Amino acid sequence: MNDKFRKYLEEAIGTDNALVAFSAFDSPASVSVRLNPFKKSDPMPGRPVSWCRYGLMLDQRPSFTLDPIFHAGAYYVQDSSSMFVGYVFRKLLEDCRLPQGRPLRVLDLCAAPGGKTTDLAASLRTVCGDDFILVANEVMKARVGVLADNVALWGDPNVVVTSDDPRAFASLGGYFDMILADVPCSGEGMFRKDEQAQLQWSEDNVALCEARQRRIIADVWPSLAENGVLIYSTCTFNRYENDLNVRWISDNLGAELLPNDADEPGVIRTEYGYSLVPGFVEGEGQYCASLRKTSSGDGLVSGRSPKSTGSSKGNQIPDGLDAYFCRKMKFALKGDTVTAVPEELAADVDMLRQYLHVISAGCAVGTLKGKILVPDADMALSIILDDSSFPRYEVDHQTALKYLHRDTIAIPEAPKGYVLICHMGLPLGFVKNLGNRCNSLHPQSRRIRMNI
């Protein structure tokens, strides 16, 4: 282990604690999942994660790819230490005064691949019901597609996926009530999982990350409302990217540090936040701290023209789409694609489209082929899809895998037309049943590629 890194770790968590951590870096990485509370499935074997009601530690890593309910969004594979950030968010959410007459507005700034986004979404729905909007942003174009897919699998219609630099959010002056910034870092917490993270570590890289993190927070800061809450997190250990950056935010941007008084097994309390370190917890490395904004800011910057939503080529939104959902939705048509957002969030989503590059919002409903709507795979996964909207057909494990592999399946006893394929009661997606065979509507981009 790099001697300079040893010094950084000892500075951050103390010499004795660092010795425990060093001995753990050679041990195998743990495996954990977080269940989707809005997609009920049979109990999974595992040990509870103490700070996450829906978290489970697994004794060994199964083939998640060959588990159909993984593709149904029944759970998300997430490191247990990462779930602690969701725990801090929940504690803050439960203590906050919810706004009246509008949804609570939350931003997950550096959201890919979506673990923390889906954790936040579950907490928001539990505490706020339908009265929230969660913007999940990822600036890297190569990663935003994975984020959008994972959000679709989770199935919550109150999540908006965007792809913008943090600077773009400055125009949304005071819009967000809460921001999670899980900022890019030197990755010291991933040393056990990623040998490249060890090889790439250097003091220069730490300094580079520290400066970049400050720039990211300073850029997004105007979009946080006065008295709004920032959760700052990294997957690294050193003080420069963690406690010292938190103090910099407080001193330079105008914020008060919130207490780090949670007492969870194995979690180390640092000067301003929490550090989760292998050897003390089963998961990987994670840091987080929270602050409340005390500085005032400007409101929305006006004067920008709305981004074009594209032509609908003379198509019209079909009648009767409300019957697909168990919530009132507002439908939109771009080209031949129909999308829907919850009616009470429509004004927020329209406004966000004026300032940001919105990748997805609400739920993709389907594609028009003439006057026929071909249902979208994302609608099958939505937690607000009405149970009676399409005929449902339950399949066994092997047939579910064949469907997810995009092999041809036949369900001659099911009604002809569009049918919702389910496994263990959870929708996997649509087929068009022709009687002797089915045309699969499962996206090529999500198909299982390994042998089944």
Where are each of the predicted segments found?
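Mobile active-site "lid"/loop adjacent to the S-adenosyl-L-methionine
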Residues: 142, 174-219, 235-242, 261
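Conserved beta-strand signature within the Rossmann-like core of class I S-adenosyl-L-methionine
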Residues: 228-234
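Conserved SAM-binding loop of SAM-dependent methyltransferases across substrates and taxa
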Residues: 113-129
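Conserved AdoMet
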Residues: 29-87
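Polybasic, low-complexity RNA-engagement segments
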Residues: 1-40, 284-287, 294-452
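S-adenosyl-L-methionine
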Residues: 139-174, 181
